[in-house]
Amino acid sequence: MCGIMGYHCFGNVRPDKEKITDMFTLLETRGRDASGFAFIRDNNLIVHKAPVKSSELTKSPDWKNLTLPKIMIMHTRMKTQGTEKNNHNNHPLFSKNGTAIVHNGIVYNDKEIFGKKQRDAEVDSESILHLLSIKARGDKIKRLFDRIEGSFAVAAIDKSQPDKLFLIKKDNPIDLYYNSSDDILYFCSEREIMQEAMNIKQITKKGFNLGENDFHFYEMENNHSLIINKDGVESYQKYSPRLTDWWEKRYYSPGKNDETLIECPWCFCQTRYFEGKLTNRCTECGMEISEEDLLNVWG
């Protein structure tokens, strides 16, 4: 489990830096092994990341001296493969041609996607960066859905399109808040983190629900991409994911104490499962998962 967050400013107003700092710090509950952020300024992609939790990164000069840009993507990492001591493994991942991504999820077939091509990192997320940054005709996001086996909540920026934010969702959460007074769109892996950091509360009067002040909540639908430009929503498109036989190929392993990746029968997110362990809990929803639960779903 990792965390992604960020924002897109449509006008000249920038977010309250203290609130963005609070949100970034709260996001470390989803990953404390590394953290980072990326943005585009003067047609240059700028990435700051380190093998520290976000509450420590926000104390660094890179963050303290930063004037918030128009668009930013951010990440907190819980490592599943690839040491955090190799900063290439930490997010945001970025390519030589100026694409940067943050990813929450699991890719099972990254070796298939890369083949014999040389890799810069040791993490499965690199396959998503590869598919989004290669120069080829056609819809790059469709290519992602066509080829990736796994789950992903992705935010991406590209220096060739500096006014755009790309959000892509398959099985992992992306929640959105639009602040109409400041004309800023925020996104995060968890709605509650945004609510707490920005002090967003439900307002009622005489029994009428008046919403959440100037904040308007949206939840991205599964298997969709959202492209935001300087004027608003450029596209919101549904895709068909690649069909796989994960249960037979991925969810069983030979050893009783081996760790396997399963789909939680309660929230349908990917989580770790130890066949020989007495108690397993989903890292996303916290529900206990038993062998009987899995048989009821997949049997």
Which residues does each predicted region cover?
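Conserved short alpha-helical segments that host acidic/polar catalytic motifs at enzyme active sites
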Residues: 1-299
